[in-house]
Amino acid sequence: MSQPSVILATASYDHTIRFWEAETGRCYRTIQYPDSHVNRLEITPDKHYLAAACNPHIRLFDVNSNSPQPVMTYDSHTNNVMAVGFQCDAKWMYSGSEDGTVKIWDLRAPGCQKEYESVAAVNTVVLHPNQTELISGDQNGNIRVWDLRANSCSCELVPEVDTAVRSLTVMWDGTMVVAANNRGTCYVWRLLRGKQTMTEFEPLHKLQAHNGHILKCLLSPANKYLATASSDKTVKIWNVDGFKLEKVLTGHQRWVWDCVFSVDGEFLVTASSDMTARLWSMPAGKEVKVYQGHHKATVCCALHD
């Protein structure tokens, strides 16, 4: 199977993962996934594999194959896996789960390599661009930085007590992190390197972005925009310089669960409970393609172009 230049995948409560031709909107591959719903999708940096974070396992699929079977299954979590991602060379994978743990997996060997206890259910995990720190957010409102070299929590903060941290995003150059919560608020920090090379958080901005839940926040690769996807059916685009609202993307009929930027930041893909994924032009702020085919809520999407 020849690999398309743009890999676009979505997953739904209909127990399928679908691959789409980004330009035409045609679904060219469907993976049936009866064991569980999929919470998160992530494509490896080399475009070879797609990770599906499920309940309670992670499965790795070959992007270039038509096989419905995963090439690897990662079992060790005991509850919903809510976050998954890869180190820049795809040597290892990280995950976060509602079982209260953050885990590291070596893609070249079976089994969990490292485990960090967050206690509360983990909703979101991101990898710092330095590749040596993971930042997690949990249901109790805690944000923790995990030092992968020291194997310990090097920093902990609570932006809003007893308010779940739903999503985290870190700037590509490692200078900023944004946390979004269930009350529609985004907290922005400047990231500083401490005396012992530990990352320190300097409060920068508090943004009341939506009246409903924020389900995903994401900084664009060009370090220009912050996207916030919400239960209010919209995605809002904020200019990182001052966090002024630039655009509101409207068209979805239900909650917007996920979003992902193209590598140049010119396009955004969104996934919604209205059973669709959509492609948006950032300069125009307009919808340019709808991906239809799922029979239930589309809850996550992955893009690698």
Curated annotation (Swiss-Prot):
Subcellular location: Endosome
Keywords in alphabetical order: Developmental protein, Endosome, Growth regulation, Repeat, WD repeat
GO biological process, one term: regulation of raffinose biosynthetic process
PROSITE patterns cross-referenced by the UniProt entry: WD_REPEATS_1, WD_REPEATS_2, WD_REPEATS_REGION
Tissues expressed in: Expressed in the root central cylinder, root tips, emerging lateral roots, vasculature of cotyledons, leaf stomata, leaf stipules, anthers, pollen, filaments, and vasculature of petals and sepals.
WD repeat copies, ranges: 1-30, 33-71, 76-115, 117-156, 160-199, 209-248, 251-292
Domain of life according to the entry: Eukaryota
Oligomeric and partner information: The target of rapamycin complex 1 (TORC1) is composed of at least RAPTOR, LST8 and TOR. Interacts with TOR.
Protein's job: Component of TORC1 complex, which is an essential cell growth regulator that controls plant development. Acts by activating transcription, protein synthesis and ribosome biogenesis, and inhibiting mRNA degradation and autophagy. Involved in regulating amino acid accumulation and the synthesis of myo-inositol and raffinose during plant adaptation to long days. Involved in the regulation of plant growth and abscisic acid (ABA) accumulation. Acts as a positive regulation of the ABA biosynthetic genes ZEP, NCED3 and AAO3, and negative regulator of the ABA catabolic genes CYP707A2 and CYP707A3.
Name the record gives this protein: Target of rapamycin complex subunit LST8-1
